[in-house]
Amino acid sequence: MKIKRILSATLAAAMLLCYCALTACASKPAAPTAADFEVQPGAYRYQDMGDFFVETEQGQYYLGWDQIIRFAEPGSRSFYPLCNKPNCGHGGENCNAYTDYALGYWNGHLYTTTYGDNGPVVMRMDMDGANHREVGRLPVLTAVDGARHGSGELLFHNGSLFYMYDAIETDPEWAMSIYQFDLETGKGRWLFQEDIPLFTYSYGSSYVNICGDDFFFKIANGVTGECTYALGNLKTGRVEATLPDWSNRNSRAMEQDSVLYYFKADAGLCEYDRATGVETVRFPMDTYTAFPCYTRNYILVRSTDTEDFEQCTLWVLDRDYNLLGKAPQEKIGRWFPQPYAITANSIYFWLNGKITHYIDTSDLSNLELLPMPDTSNARAHG
């Protein structure tokens, strides 16, 4: 996301389990263990389409367009502002739940960013939203004409913040750039500098995925318009391979056991074996584009069926590509709700800057979107 509060459409995934606490409505949900998470807390959530959703043993957190962090107890779907200050209106910098941009987790703390005169500032806070303090600052790029630039998009993964800077296209030799910031030490390094060609720009977090030590991102050539999908390695800081002719209608890729999984335009759901270089179409789809979310046990797909974006469909398949459920989406107002985050008991949907609906994962043959609990007049959390 460019330094503005627009959440991109992206890939996601999670496992088909229910928290046992849901069977006892009157009791407080049991705290989840590490086995309940699709990825470990702090790792990049490849199963989600939204960026700023955090799931830990303390509960679930997400950041809305209103710049308020919201929290739900483990197993619950009721989200509240992460602030326990009395009489707080939850709308300004004095609120514990308020932040400028981004939300991540690492080692018992939440992380976010604010924007000062000298560029983006990385902040650390306690899990209840209290005790905001500065960790460090991200670099600001200086153009040939002396102008300063700090716009870009960011992601969190395993103790690092990854910042994808916009290219400074006024420079004679411009290109995109990616910076890795350590959340513990405040130190950083530039990634893939030797491998990113000149006159290229990033497609942002919509096309980025991080799986273990692999960092996948899309590179667009600003001169020819051609796009490639880069397969980078975080240990070496180098791009190991690229997939050419990556259509704007393709999804981003997720990797498991050296196999890439993605939607390919005019083909369908595909697998690409990195060892052999062989691509296989596993589930043909006649749709304009699609964004799959891969979990351990199932695949959720939201397809855009027509070029005018006026028809969308939800699909659920098992990992052997057997169709479990399919349903056309309906607009709410002008827009279709989009899949945002997947937990053990819910597929959350996003509309107009917040989570508004969910699907209960206990029965994936029923893809009915249910409204989220109304917490507008309820207490805050902290």
Language model features with spans:
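Repeated scaffold domains used in trafficking and secretory/extracellular systems
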Residues: 45-56, 91-107, 141-158, 196-212, ...
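Short loop/turn segments that connect beta-strands within the blades of beta-propeller domains
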Residues: 56, 64-66, 75, 106-107, ...
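Surface-exposed loop/turn elements that mediate protein-protein interactions on large endomembrane-trafficking
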Residues: 28-46, 68-92, 120-143, 170-197, ...
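Hydrophobic core
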Residues: 15-19
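Residue position within the beta-strands of beta-propeller blades
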Residues: 62-64, 111-113, 162-165, 216-218, ...
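C-terminal motif of bacterial Sec signal peptides marking the signal peptidase cleavage site
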Residues: 21-24
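C-terminal regulatory/effector modules of DNA-binding transcriptional regulators
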Residues: 163, 175, 203-209, 217-218, ...
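Bacterial N-terminal signal peptides that target proteins for export
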Residues: 1-11
